[in-house]
From Swiss-Prot:
SMART domains linked: BRLZ
Amino acid composition bias (Polar residues), ranges on this chain: 146-170, 422-436, 451-462
Sites where a glycan is attached: 450, 462, 609, 617, 643, 651
Signal peptide range in chain numbering: none
Protein name: bZIP transcription factor 17
Length: 721
């Protein structure tokens, strides 16, 4: 067994005055036991060198063994190959820690009892306090190692670890190792260390320079590659542009050559024409200057065929021969005469003058036509009020105070078919289109034209067409439009009421009461001496025509009332003891009329042709809800003995005349005079009425509105019993 290393520590050595190391500090005062008991810190270095076998002289280092060193390549891992001869392995050459150096990993053979030989661990620089790292498990080791005073770094721990690995069962067993160091091995180790340091520096520099060169070469190659590519692209562009320019020049030259050829051909053609014209001119001059004998005229050559130009002149030409160019072109040297420019200004002026003349003519025609149109309008407007378009008559605006039967004839012809039929018994109403009227009052014109009403009466329609109408009622001196469907509904109701009384219709027909058109009064035919008074009624203004006939002749009204009173056939206007004004033959005036228009969706009235029959003293029991409401049953108009067709009836045949169908539709009250409602069946209430409006349906196709004037309150009136 070897001696244990645990023993008393020797006292710290005295500081060496020749030593270069600084004086030990408090930490350095702690003594560290050496790995080998044969060496101590107090032993001088000279003795150690002598023990190692080195001479006392200078120590020399040689680098003869540099070739035997192994340097790994860049791609190889830093592994030291194992030498089979001495069973040693060189460690990694990479620095690991502060005490980096060439550290050898001790390989422990399988045979644990044998002596373990390890390579020496030599550090570059190791402080003195690094021996603390080897303390601990190294107290049980006896490793005689040279240069133990320099510290062993981590070698002690490595060896101990290897030893412990080889013998894990006995950790506290001290391992005796005898390291045999030879002089040659020591020298080789030191030389190898220095060579390795130098080689590492050289290798680093070479690597850096190599990397530098490789980077520079790569950059230079990249730059040169880009420049070459640019040069190639530039060359390609230049070649393409040069080729395109050559092609353009070639095409341009070809076009110019083609133009030159065309010009030469044109010049040749023109030269031929000029020579032909000049020859013809010379021939004509010769003929004029000679005896007047004209040679036979040669026909002109066809188009495109001109006589060739001869180099020698014509015998009759006074001018010298042509000078031909040497190039072969037949262009003469004589100047070609230019054509005189046309007078464009004169033509433009002529065109302008023509356009101005045409415009003036157009304006004249337009003005004349416009004047003619104005004249026609003026003529038509002046004659329109005179001519009665509806009935083909002429109004008496230009007749003045002529005492002629023609006015009477015009009245009869103008107001025919406008007779309101009233029965004396009040049974019904109707309109007869009687054309048997007096054509004159002269004794010379004794023949009278009698036409039965049945021949000229208008037959009612079959009721297949829808009828739509509108009613205009005067209100506040204005005409207010009222829907005609209300009137048509009233007509239907009235026709139903009349149809129920058809069996008791009266067969007697009395004279008709004529109502003049265009607001003219329906007066009896006056004597010849009263034509002026009739003309006064005919030529009144429109406002006067819409008023009552009270402004007319008072004597006429009195005579008519007396006649009606004498006849005793007037009917009552209101019932229950209230005396009302009665109608007379001169109290109704036509206000307006309108035809029923046929449109889809309207009410279709019945097509029955019946006459209304209404008994005497008929009372309307319905109350008036509005001043314009339609009455339930038609109100008959009283008959009259004085009739325009009375004389005609005496001279006519005895057969019965059937008038056309007519019906009183409604009776309206003037809103300015009527009250708001009925008072005991009275239309106007306690306020007296001056006029009423009566709407009559003629032949189920035309509505006529009459304005009937009631006598004044002071006028005489009768009440039938």
């Amino acid at each position: 067994m070897a001696e244990p290393i645990t023993k008393e520590q020797p006292p710290p050595p005295a500081p060496d005055p020749n030593s270069t190391y600084p004086p030990p500090s408090d930490f350095d005062s702690i003594s560290i036991p050496p790995l080998d008991d044969h060496f101590s810190d107090q032993t001088p270095i000279g003795e150690l060198m002598s023990d190692l076998g080195f001479p006392d002289g200078e120590f020399e280092l040689t680098f003869d063994g540099m070739d035997d060193l192994y340097f790994p390549a860049e791609n190889e891992s830093f592994l030291i190959p194992i030498n089979t001869s001495n069973q040693e392995q060189f460690g990694d050459f990479t620095p690991e820690s502060e005490s980096s150096g060439i550290s050898g990993d001790c390989i422990v053979p399988k045979d644990a009892d044998k002596t373990i030989t390890t390579s020496g661990c030599i550090n570059r620089e190791s402080p003195r306090d690094s021996d603390d790292r080897c303390s601990g498990a190294d107290h049980n080791l006896d490793l005689p190692t040279p240069l133990s005073s320099q510290g062993s770094g981590n070698c002690g721990s490595d060896v101990s670890e290897a030893t412990n690995e080889s013998s894990p069962k006995s950790r506290n067993v001290a391992v005796d190792q005898k390291v045999k160091v030879e002089e040659a091995a020591t020298t080789t180790t030191s030389i190898t260390k220095r060579k390795k340091e130098i080689d590492e520096d050289l290798t680093d520099e070479s690597r850096n320079s190599k990397y530098r060169r490789s980077g520079e070469d790569a950059d230079a190659s990249a730059v040169t590659g880009e420049e070459d590519e640019k040069k190639r692209a530039r060359l390609m562009r230049n070649r393409e542009s040069a080729q395109l320019s050559r092609q353009r020049k070639k095409h341009y030259v070809e076009e110019l050559e083609e133009k030159v050829r065309n010009m030469h051909s044109t010049i040749t053609d023109l030269n031929g024409k000029i020579s032909y014209f000049m020859a013809e001119n010379a021939t004509l001059r010769q003929q004029l200057g000679g005896n007047g004998m004209c040679p036979p005229h040669l026909p002109p050559p066809p188009m495109g065929m001109y006589p060739p130009m001869a180099p020698m002149p014509y015998p009759w030409m006074p001018c010298p021969p042509y000078m031909v160019k040497q190039q072969g072109s037949q262009v003469p040297l004589i100047p070609i005469p230019r054509l005189k420019p046309q007078n464009t200004l004169g033509t433009s002026k002529a065109k302008k003058s023509e356009s101005k003349k045409s415009e003036a003519k157009t304006k004249k025609v337009a003005s004349i036509s416009f004047l003619g149109l104005l004249f026609c309008l003026f003529l038509f407007g002046a004659l329109a009020p005179i001519v009665n378009v509806n009935y083909g008559g002429i109004s008496g605006a230009f007749y003045g105070n002529y005492r002629s039967n023609y006015i009477t004839d015009q009245i009869y012809s103008q107001h025919r078919d406008r007779v309101l039929d009233t029965s004396r018994s009040g049974a019904g109403t109707g309109v007869s289109n009687s054309n048997g009227m007096h054509r004159g009052r002269d004794s010379d014109r004794g023949a009278r034209k009698n036409i039965s009403a049945t021949e000229s009466s208008v037959t009612p329609g079959n009721g297949s067409e829808p009828l739509v109408a509108s009613l205009f009622v005067p209100r506040n001196d204005k005409l207010v439009k009222i829907d005609g469907n209300l009137i048509i509904n009233s007509i239907l109701a009235s026709e139903k009421a009349v149809a129920s009384r058809k069996a008791s219709e009266s067969k007697e027909r009395k004279a008709d009461l004529m109502i003049s058109k265009d607001y003219t009064p329906a007066l009896p035919l006056p004597d010849v001496g009263r034509t002026e008074e009739l003309a006064k009624h005919l030529y009144r203004s429109k406002a006067e025509k819409q008023k009552a006939l009270s402004s007319g002749s008072a004597d006429t009204l009195k005579d008519q009332v007396k006649t009606k009173a004498a006849n005793g056939e007037m009917q009552q206007w209101f019932r229950e003891g209230v005396a009302g004004p009665m109608f007379s033959s001169g109290m109704c005036t036509e206000v307006f009329q309108f035809d029923v228009s046929s449109t889809s969706g309207a009410i279709i009235p019945a097509a029955t042709n019946v006459s209304a029959e209404h008994g005497k003293n008929t009372t309307d029991t319905h109350k008036q809800q509005n001043r314009r409401i339609l009455r339930g049953l038609p109100i008959p108009l009283p008959g009259s003995d004085f009739n325009l067709t009375k004389e005609h009836q005496r001279n006519s045949s005895s057969k019965e005349i059937k008038p056309a169908s007519s019906m009183v539709v409604s009776v309206l009250v003037d809103p300015r005079e009527g009250g708001d409602g009925d008072i005991d069946g009275m239309i106007g209430g306690p306020k007296s009425l001056s006029r009423v409006f009566v709407v009559v349906l003629l032949d189920s196709a035309k509505y006529v509105t009459y304005s009937c004037v009631l006598p004044r309150s002071g006028a005489p009136h009768l009440v039938t019993t």
